[in-house]
Amino acid sequence: MLLSRRALLAGASAGVLSTPALAQSSGWNRDAFLAAMRDSGRSIEISEGAFAAIQARRQPTLARMEAYLKSRFGEADPAVLRGFAELPREYFHYNYEARQASPSNAYETEAKPWALGFGSALSDYLGQAYMTQACQPKPDHVVLEIGTGSGFQAAWLSRIVAKQYSIEIIEPLGRSVQQIFAPLGLTNVETRVGDGFYGWPEVTGGFDTIIVTCAAQYVPPALIQQLKPGGRLVIPIGQPFRRGQFLYIYTKDEEGRVRSRKDMGVYFIPMTGAMMKTPAPAGSVPQ
């Protein structure tokens, strides 16, 4: 039996944040996990004992995340915690190039990135938590992600916002990850294969938030253009495969003026495509 969005939300509202919502729901068990994996085109075998061990690590992981966000922001956004709790992270641990699932790696004590194949990675959950809260997501928001990767960041934001878009430039990865949202009932996620440098201009009205999950050498002009007044762009900026990358927060006020703030040091794989071929426009590289 697959879990619908309504069932996920019902599980969340029935419990407390200290226990993940899917763990509370009778709908998420080993059989549901295997069915969702199969329906997303990713077969796997896992024992009851191994699946139970994964679930036992969820609550400690959520507690670590809450403590981390409080240490960074002064408070942990309940919507961010709830969004994480509503998702089975083990479902997203998959190497698409090797066609190999690794659910037992989920909810690791020391958060770290995991290979997805094709040069991409599932980011560590604490880094994803930080960027999610930095987005300041709200229930009526329309959000664009550049760099779908595993799909976990898009899925996480989809639990909080009205509509989530995501673009992946690596075609075999993007085509495969397009299949993983429906089996979890994530109907407000729309993805496509393309170059995130150009954003998603067909979306009428633009975006409340744009989150970039790869390191850009400068801010793509299209992303600023597609940001709504009052919108927010969260983007890592720095040179490819070098230290010294930083997260930047750009905001656009109601008059269209854009301001930026340098945030924490980060390390991401580079934005490819047009970013590598197009000279930086004047003023697009933060000082």
Report residues per predicted region.
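Class I SAM-dependent transferase core
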Residues: G27-P139, Y267
